[in-house]
Each structure stands twice: as structure tokens, then as C-alpha cells.
């Protein structure tokens, strides 16, 4: 086993604090509307420029092992906040640094670290409660756009694009961010349920110019097995012909005689029909066919359900307002499924998402959820250079996560104001144990840190800004707009943060910082000493003295 290097008490805390400071100082320059960028060297390709706190944090690895441990703990704060809320990573880092710094001073002065942590936890709970109580529900598309704009570093175009996407696909819909091939950033929305299977034969096309098959108000037959003969289907085909409506057949595969018969009928005009393969594979295919059945109020024809093809009647077929089939994709628009059935299915998928441990499964389940809930939107981020596109994509990702969080738990005044106002609730806490009270004091001071940093990045003295906002007791939403360097009503000015992001940042920062403050010893691998190289043999032949 390798030898270990051990550091104790003040020596350990000093090293750890230095690591915390190095990482936090690199991350906090990105905070606020006037935050700067950080350039990160890549082992290949162009350097990466970003204003995303967690991206910077993940790149930092220090040479000194003890300093690195401190840095890694704060990196954990940023990663955790990013995983839960998707934004607020820089705020969390600034809060963690403030709590650790103050905590280290108190511990050095001889205060009990465990009581100190208890005080930090009590104060954090009070502040979180206050933030949740202040949260205002997001009701309009404009408010959604405001949240997106603030998170995208004041980029209005991004904020409005996200609001538009959310309006189209709903809060459960999937919004993905991709890199565009052009310089423009654009939004592409697919309404209804789309799956990646196209028509089985080009003869099904109804619009030759666009190469698509469009079926208005069709019946939909959902079959989980292969169809190689249409004999068993004749009764239901005849019933569909009587109604004069088109028919879409979704099956594992349609081959040979069955496909030929359908094509001939389509060309003769007897039956308006189109056939596509079922999406997915294995169990996922079955689940997706069930989703389609629920969406269209149809019945999935499966032998294990005891339904045979020859017994299928018209009421067992699904219905939709319109179906559009392209070479690669099929979109079912406005299925007639019952709202209650669809909602039941959605909550079932949500429960599966909660339980799954596989990222791949989670992604696929979220796709299914979005398709049921109303659609998929793709934001394609464009820019003049690859570096610019990557930087912009980071901001769009942040804005998207912040917007989702805002819809979930509401919004609070932005720019660090909500944390500053939470001081009032924390100040009311009183403890008989002086060391616990010291922990409460630490959080009281730390709650100012994000606002101070935002002001500092804008070139304004942080303590003056904090003083001005604290003195104004008439309005709870009064704050500092760092973009214009004015004092405004933050909600009216549209400077808002999602409550979930602010809450998560504080909880994660306090959790990790509390652990760092209570550290008394640190253990790391001792540096390996390089053994000196063996001496070179002397020249000349042995035994000869010249």
C-alpha cells in the first residue's frame, strides 16, 4: 500500500481553504450580467470559452493533493446544483466559499465545529423556507422569457425562443439544444407524436411534390406482429372502406402479399391507405405502441391480450385529426385519446423515470413522455465560429434549465436579492448555545456574498449596494440591476431567478461547506520520491591503468 501524507487541524484547513479559493475565484468571475468569460485549454482543438460555472469548475485540477481536495469538494457543490436545478452553479460556489471562509475563522478562534455546523444547518433551513414562501408562480409567456433571458446572460433572443418553445410543447415537452450548421439560431417545433419510421412504400405518397403521405381524419390500426397476408384483416378493411376514411397501419413489418395488396388498393383508389413500421425495438416497441393506442383511443392488437386480427372491429381502431408520413418520420397530430387516460400514462412514465438508474433508459422515457405530452422542440444554436457556438450552447442549456425550474417552483427577485432578503428570517433565529449562534451568523454573512460578487463584477462596491438594498424596507423586490447599474423593482424590471435554483444553490453550498468546516484531518497519497538514476559505468577496459 502506498505511503500516506496526513495533515491536521489548522494546517489541513489552510490547505483546503486555499484549494476552495482557487476554484471559487476562477468560477465567480462569471457571475451576473457583467460577469467575464473563462478560457479553458483543450488537449486538442481550439480552447473553450465559457461563462458557465460548472464547466469551469469541472476543468480545475490542482497539483497539491490537499488543495485539490478542497477544490474537489466545491466542484461537487457546482455539479450537484447543476444536476438538480441545471443552473445556479456559480451562485452555489460563491455561497460555499463564503461559508467555508467564515467558518474557518471561527474554528481557528476555538469554536466547536460540530455546533457551528448545527447553526449553519438551522440558518439554511430558515433561509430556504423564506425563499419558498416568497416564490411567485410563473403564469405568462413573458415571465418565462424573462427567466430565460437572465440565465442566458441577458440574451433576449434566447429567452424568447425558449418561451415560444415551451408554449408550443408544454411544460412536459422535450426541448433539445443542438449545434446548427448555419450562423443563425433557430427553433424547430414538432407538434403531436412523432416517431422515426417512414412509409413502407413510396406508392403511399399523397403529395408527390413534397414526397409525403397526408391522411385526414384517418383510422389507425396498431398491430404488434408482422403482417404477411391480409386475409385476416379483410373484415376491418371492408368496414373502413364503407366509412370512406383513410387508414394508417402500424405493424412490426408488412411484407410480401400484404404490402402488394395494400399498394394495389391504394393505386386503384378503393382504399386510402398507408403503412409504416412500428417504432423502437423489443419491450420499448410494445410500450410505444401502447402509447400510440392511448393517444388515439385505439386498441393495440396483440395476441397476448387475446385479440386476434380477424375479430378486430372499427371501434378498436385509433383515430386522429391528421397523420403526416415522410420518408423517415411519421407524425400523429391531435389523437382523440381521453385526457384522463393520457394523464394516467404520463404519471406512469414519470414514476418509471424516478425509479430508473440508467441514463439511457431515462432519456428514452423522457422522449416518450414528451411525445405523449404534446411535442418536441429543437433549438439549433448558430454562430460564426465553433468556439462561439459552444459558448452560446452553454448559455442556452442554462437558460432552458432555469426556465424549467421556474415553471416548477416559481420565481423570486433576481440578482442575489432573494438571498439578501432571506437574512431577515435567519436573523430571527436565536440559540442559547453561543457556538450554534456563530453558525447562524456565518450564513447571515454568506447570504450577501452573491449580490456582492455581482456588484463587484459590474465594477461597483459590493458593500454599498448591500447597504442600500437592506435600508430599503418599503419594497421586498427592490434590488440592484447590474446591467444598467440602477436600483429598481426587480420583478417589474424582469430580473428574476427560479426559486428552485436559488434554494438548491444554498442547500448544496451549506451541505458541503458544513462538512469542510468540520474537517480536522486530511489524508492523501505521499508524493513518490524519484530514485536517483544508477551511476554510469566508467569508460576504458578494466585492469588497464593509463
UniProtKB/Swiss-Prot annotation:
Similarity comment: family membership: Belongs to the chaperonin (HSP60) family.
Full protein name: Chaperonin GroEL
Sequence ranges of Gly residues compositional bias: 537-546
Taxonomy of the source species: Bacteria, Pseudomonadati, Pseudomonadota, Alphaproteobacteria, Hyphomicrobiales
Chief place of localization: cytoplasm
A Pfam family recorded for this sequence: Cpn60_TCP1
Region of interest (Disordered), residue spans: 527-546
Record EC number: 5.6.1.7
Subcellular location per the Swiss-Prot or TrEMBL entry: Cytoplasm
Alphabetical GO biological process terms: protein refolding
GO CC field: cytoplasm
The species this protein was found in: Methylobacterium radiotolerans (strain ATCC 27329 / DSM 1819 / JCM 2831 / NBRC 15690 / NCIMB 10815 / 0-1)
Amino acid at each position: 500500500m502506498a505511503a500516506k501524507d496526513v495533515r491536521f487541524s489548522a494546517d489541513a484547513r489552510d490547505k483546503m481553504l486555499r484549494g476552495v479559493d482557487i476554484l471559487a475565484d476562477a468560477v465567480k468571475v462569471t457571475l451576473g450580467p457583467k460577469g467575464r468569460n473563462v478560457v479553458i485549454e483543450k488537449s486538442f482543438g481550439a480552447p473553450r470559452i465559457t461563462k458557465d460555472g460548472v464547466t469551469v469548475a469541472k476543468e480545475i485540477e490542482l497539483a497539491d493533493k490537499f488543495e485539490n481536495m478542497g477544490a474537489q469538494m466545491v466542484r461537487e457543490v457546482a455539479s450537484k446544483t447543476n444536476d438538480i436545478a441545471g443552473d445556479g452553479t456559480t451562485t452555489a460556489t460563491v455561497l460555499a466559499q463564503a461559508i467555508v471562509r467564515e467558518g474557518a475563522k471561527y474554528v481557528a478562534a476555538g469554536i466547536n465545529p460540530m455546533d457551528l455546523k448545527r447553526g449553519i444547518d438551522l440558518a439554511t433551513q430558515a433561509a430556504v423556507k423564506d425563499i419558498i414562501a416568497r416564490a411567485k408562480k410563473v403564469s405568462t409567456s413573458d415571465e418565462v422569457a424573462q427567466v430565460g433571458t437572465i440565465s442566458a446572460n441577458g440574451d433576449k433572443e434566447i429567452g424568447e425562443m425558449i418561451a415560444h418553445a415551451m408554449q408550443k410543447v408544454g411544460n412536459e415537452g422535450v426541448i433539445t439544444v443542438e449545434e446548427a450548421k448555419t450562423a443563425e439560431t433557430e427553433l424547430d417545433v414538432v407538434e403531436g407524436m412523432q416517431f422515426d419510421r417512414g412509409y413502407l412504400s413510396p406508392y403511399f405518397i399523397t403529395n408527390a411534390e413534397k414526397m409525403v403521405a397526408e391522411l385526414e381524419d384517418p383510422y389507425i390500426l396498431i398491430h404488434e406482429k408482422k403482417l404477411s397476408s391480409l386475409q385476416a384483416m379483410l373484415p376491418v378493411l371492408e368496414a373502413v372502406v364503407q366509412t370512406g376514411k383513410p387508414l394508417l397501419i402500424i405493424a412490426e413489418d408488412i411484407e410480401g402479399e400484404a404490402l402488394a395488396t395494400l399498394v394495389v388498393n391504394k393505386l386503384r383508389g378503393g382504399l386510402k391507405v398507408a403503412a409504416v413500421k412500428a417504432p423502437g425495438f423489443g419491450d420499448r416497441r410494445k410500450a410505444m405502441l401502447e402509447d400510440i393506442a392511448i393517444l388515439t383511443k385505439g386498441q393495440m392488437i396483440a395476441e397476448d391480450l387475446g385479440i386476434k386480427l380477424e375479430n378486430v372491429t372499427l371501434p378498436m381502431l385509433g383515430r386522429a385529426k391528421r397523420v403526416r408520413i415522410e420518408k423517415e418520420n411519421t407524425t400523429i397530430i391531435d389523437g382523440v385519446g381521453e385526457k384522463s387516460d393520457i394523464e394516467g400514462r404520463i404519471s406512469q412514465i414519470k414514476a418509471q423515470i424516478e425509479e430508473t438508474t440508467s441514463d439511457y433508459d431515462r432519456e428514452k422515457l423522457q422522449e416518450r413522455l414528451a411525445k405523449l405530452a404534446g411535442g418536441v422542440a429543437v433549438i439549433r444554436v448558430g454562430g460564426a465560429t465553433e468556439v462561439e457556438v459552444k459558448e452560446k450552447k452553454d448559455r442556452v442549456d442554462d437558460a432552458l434549465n432555469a426556465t424549467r425550474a421556474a415553471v416548477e417552483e416559481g420565481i423570486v427577485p433576481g440578482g442575489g436579492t432573494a438571498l439578501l432578503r432571506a437574512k431577515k428570517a435567519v436573523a430571527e433565529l436565536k440559540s442559547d448555545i453561543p457556538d450554534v449562534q456563530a453558525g447562524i451568523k456565518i450564513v447571515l454573512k454568506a447570504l450577501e456574498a452573491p449580490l456582492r460578487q455581482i456588484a463587484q463584477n459590474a465594477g461597483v462596491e459590493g458593500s454599498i449596494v448591500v447597504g442600500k438594498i437592506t435600508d430599503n424596507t418599503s419594497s421586498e423586490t427592490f434590488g440592484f440591476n447590474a446591467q444598467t447599474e440602477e436600483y429598481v423593482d426587480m420583478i417589474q424590471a424582469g430580473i428574476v431567478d427560479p426559486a428552485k435554483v436559488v434554494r438548491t444553490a444554498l442547500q448544496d453550498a451549506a451541505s458541503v461547506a458544513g462538512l469542510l468546516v468540520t474537517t480536522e484531518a486530511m489524508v492523501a497519497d505521499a508524493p513518490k520520491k524519484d530514485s536517483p538514476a544508477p551511476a554510469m559505468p566508467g569508460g576504458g577496459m578494466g585492469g588497464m591503468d593509463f
